[in-house]
């Protein structure tokens, strides 16, 4: 996805060895190593992680609650198990669904309080990671990001309703309460920030 691409662009600042793992991996930089794997398969995940000092998980699944409930915990278990076995540091790029409704700023101290079914799945994933960290079995950090905008995000709310309208000489549209603050994440910044967290 777009965050994986932006992360891959940022990683050469920290390492000369980047392995991109996907069902259909494509190079972002000339020196990228490509590794085809399905992270729902534990053996393929183990092989994909083998030899890695840092593992970044930026994968996405179909935006469907039934898929999320069944596939996300399995995928996460496979990645956690592989990182534990390989002694790899783990960086999970997550959204903010697990926070639920927040009045004010979101920080590392914001409580996990999901109000949606997808938020409950994300909270479960966060718990899976942090349980292993607290037991001393895993070094991990969870990056959180709000709604995206930026290059290669043509379907983002901001791109469609604001920037595309401006390009056409139209007024921007906004379907959110104009009196409430709403955070957005610029995708190149998300990639750079995620790279920093692993180094």
Regions found by a protein language model. Give the residues of each.
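N-terminal Rossmann-fold NAD(P) dinucleotide-binding loop
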Residues: 4-5
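Aromatic pocket-lining residues of Rossmann-like dinucleotide-binding sites
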Residues: 11
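NAD(P)H-binding glycine-rich loop region in Rossmannoid oxidoreductase-like domains
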Residues: 26-86
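Conserved Rossmann-fold NAD(P)-dependent oxidoreductase catalytic core, especially the SDR/UDP-sugar
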Residues: 77-124, 133, 141
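Conserved beta-loop-beta element that borders a ligand/cofactor-binding pocket
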Residues: 95, 127-152
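Glycine-rich "substrate-gating" loop/helix at the edge of Rossmann-like oxidoreductase active sites
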Residues: 118, 146-155, 176-188
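Glycine/proline-rich active-site loop of Rossmann-fold NAD(P)-dependent oxidoreductases
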Residues: 123, 150-162, 197-199
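A conserved pocket-lining segment of Rossmann-fold NAD(P)-dependent short-chain dehydrogenase/reductase
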Residues: 164-185, 196-197
């Amino acid at each position: 996805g777009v965050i994986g691409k932006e992360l891959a662009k940022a990683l050469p600042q920290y390492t000369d060895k980047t392995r991109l793992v996907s069902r259909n991996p494509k190079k972002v930089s000339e020196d990228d190593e490509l590794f085809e794997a399905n992270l729902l398969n534990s053996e393929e995940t183990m092989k994909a992680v083998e030899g890695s000092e840092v593992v970044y998980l930026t994968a996405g699944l179909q935006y469907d609650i039934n898929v999320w409930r069944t596939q996300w915990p399995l995928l996460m278990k496979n990645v956690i198990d592989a990182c534990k076995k390989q002694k790899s540091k783990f960086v999970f790029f997550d959204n903010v669904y697990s926070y639920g409704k927040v009045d004010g700023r979101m920080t590392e101290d914001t409580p996990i309080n999901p109000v949606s079914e997808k938020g409950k799945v994300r909270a479960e994933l966060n718990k899976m990671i942090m349980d292993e960290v607290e037991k001393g079995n895993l070094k991990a950090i969870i990056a959180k990001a709000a709604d995206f905008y930026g290059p290669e995000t043509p379907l983002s709310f901001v791109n469609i309703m604001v920037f595309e309208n401006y390009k056409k000489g139209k007024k921007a549209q906004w379907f959110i309460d104009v009196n409430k603050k709403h955070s957005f994440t610029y995708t190149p910044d998300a990639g750079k920030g995620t790279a920093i967290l692993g180094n």
